[in-house]
């Protein structure tokens, strides 16, 4: 059959609408935190779609300090909430994963309280999940509270060596998404 210009225009518009639908973009960032007196309190690496860069940033961090009780978790959370370039898109999924093995210092007074920080995160549309490494019960209680107040999930990460890396068919594709 013969296509009229209106038909061609309608079909082109339909194709352009389909092609123009944005696919989800994954952006990740890091905020490393330690404690006062360590070589740094926080190091923030802003959100990026380049997952290779996130991995490189992660490799620049080394464990240090620690083992001496609470850390400046509140400053790390504050930086994650306020210093990352979060999307302003209403439909964007915005999540923080707090990962650590120590409870927060709540006696410094240089940040809002844990409750205030998590309320701010929720108001900004952020979900705060908490992954506790190890089995310290005080840290576990704090991380459970973070997940509850941050409307996220608590994720225990055992440190007994029983964790295994499992390759998936999606690993190569995930790496490509960051390029």
Regions found by a protein language model. Give the residues of each.
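Divalent cation-coordinating acidic motifs and surrounding scaffolds
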Residues: 1-176
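Conserved catalytic region of serine esterases and O-acyltransferases that act on ester linkages
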Residues: 179
């Amino acid at each position: 059959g013969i296509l009229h210009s209106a038909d061609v225009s309608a079909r082109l518009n339909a194709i352009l609408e389909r092609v123009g639908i944005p696919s989800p973009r994954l952006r990740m960032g890091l905020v490393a935190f330690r404690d006062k007196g360590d070589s740094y309190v926080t190091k923030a690496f802003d959100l990026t779609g380049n997952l290779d860069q996130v991995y490189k940033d992660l490799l620049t961090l080394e464990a240090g300090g620690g083992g001496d009780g609470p850390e400046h978790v509140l400053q790390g959370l504050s930086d994650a909430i306020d210093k990352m370039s979060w999307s302003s898109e209403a439909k964007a999924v915005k999540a923080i994963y707090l990962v650590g093995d120590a409870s927060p210092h709540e006696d410094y007074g240089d940040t809002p309280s844990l409750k205030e920080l998590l309320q701010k995160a929720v108001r900004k549309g952020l979900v705060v999940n908490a992954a506790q490494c190890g089995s310290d019960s005080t840290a576990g209680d704090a991380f459970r509270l973070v997940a509850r107040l941050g409307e996220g999930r608590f994720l225990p990460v055992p440190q007994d060596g029983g964790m295994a890396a499992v390759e998936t068919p999606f690993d190569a594709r995930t790496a490509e998404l960051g390029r």
